[in-house]
Amino acid sequence: DIYNEDGTKVALMDNDAAVKAARFLYDLKFKYGVLPEESMALVGTEVRNQFIEGNIAIASMDAKSGTVLTDAGVNWDFIPSLEDETRATWIASDALIMNSASQNKELAASLIKYITSAEVMAKFHTEIAPFPPITRDEDERFKEMYEDAEHLHTLPVANGAFKVMDTLYKNLQLMMLGDLSPEEAIQNTVDYAESIG
């Protein structure tokens, strides 16, 4: 995790997990040579197109790419997270919240169930938002995500979190360009967080 449990401190150096994850990415390029130079310059659609053409074996993509891959005839699958001692991945999330003062909680719960049903989500994601519907009664490929959701984390809600996340992203980019070591990328992010905190 980027922050400690109560969101008051950047926890990237509290154990070796962040450096190990950064080292894994770094080694893919600099030790094993499986990430070509141009890989860092590719944007989302270019990555997806290269994947469709068979030039990329594994890629991290946004959720809407699933529909594009299927439409292109690609037999694809996904894993929610790589795994070492533990596993985790960041996910985007929205929430439908029932007010505790609601006078008709049963009606509110029924509305939430209706809105999140596969039928409504399919319509929502074809007519309003171009992301594939991912609900518990949707594509079998997403079943594991709903059965074992403890490894899914939303972005941290903490003071200055956006600035820290942006700095981490930039430091990891510098690392992948060879300007920082994995240890420096993580430590520089922690130092920045402490300077604004």
Where are these regions (language model features)?
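Short, Asp-centered acidic motifs that coordinate Mg2+ and/or phosphate
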Residues: 53, 57-58
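Short helix-initiation/N-cap motifs at beta->coil->alpha
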Residues: 37-52
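Extracytoplasmic/secreted envelope proteins and their assembly/folding machinery
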Residues: 19-22, 26, 48, 52, ...
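Glycine-centered hinge/linker elements that transmit conformational signals in sensory
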Residues: 7-39
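Soluble non-cytosolic domains of exported or imported proteins
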Residues: 12-19, 45, 102-106, 158-166, ...
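C-terminal lobe and pocket-closing loops
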Residues: 59, 63-75, 84-170
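Conserved C-terminal helix/tail region of periplasmic/extracytoplasmic solute-binding proteins
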Residues: 30, 147-197
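Acidic/polar loop patches that form or flank catalytic/metal-binding clefts of enzymes
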Residues: 3, 34-38, 59, 77, ...
